[in-house]
Amino acid sequence: VLSGSDKNNVKGVFGKIGGHAEEYGAETLERMFATYPQTKTYFPHFDLQHGSAQVKAHGKKVAAALVEAANHIDDISGALSKLSDLHAQKLRVDPVNFKLLGQCFLVVVAIHHPSVLTPEVHASLDKFLCAVGNVLTAKYR
């Protein structure tokens, strides 16, 4: 459960990310594909090379979902309901991949904003990313 402090920390991070969300989304995917090659299996039709238009486009979608969740932090499940349906009913992505994506997003934030990612903010952002992953997999059951 996200505390009031956690919510403020998450909003602060997304405030710093600002106009870089799409870039960070693509960078997160590239990092995930490189670090966890098994995640590539969900994208057999993608050009997964650095700078790929397909990775950038999907990174934009990932970033938009995270921004949407942060903007509706008191109702993440409502904000991501359609995306949850898509992942549960059509895409059937293994739930562990959301954790891997979250780890990679944390690394990207740390690279670009090292002073922002204090231990407290890191913990809050990790809790938020876990909450997003839980919402995206809630309808699998």
Swiss-Prot record:
Heme b binds at H87. It comes from the Eukaryota. GO terms for biological process: hydrogen peroxide catabolic process. Residues 1-141 form the Globin domain. GO terms for cellular component: blood microparticle; haptoglobin-hemoglobin complex; hemoglobin complex. GO terms for molecular function: haptoglobin binding; heme binding; iron ion binding; organic acid binding; oxygen binding; oxygen carrier activity; peroxidase activity. The keyword rRNA-binding does not apply. O2 binds at H58. Pfam families: Globin. Red blood cells. Keywords: Heme, Iron, Metal-binding, Oxygen transport, Transport. Heterotetramer of two alpha chains and two beta chains. Involved in oxygen transport from the lung to the various peripheral tissues. Belongs to the globin family. This is Hemoglobin subunit alpha-1.
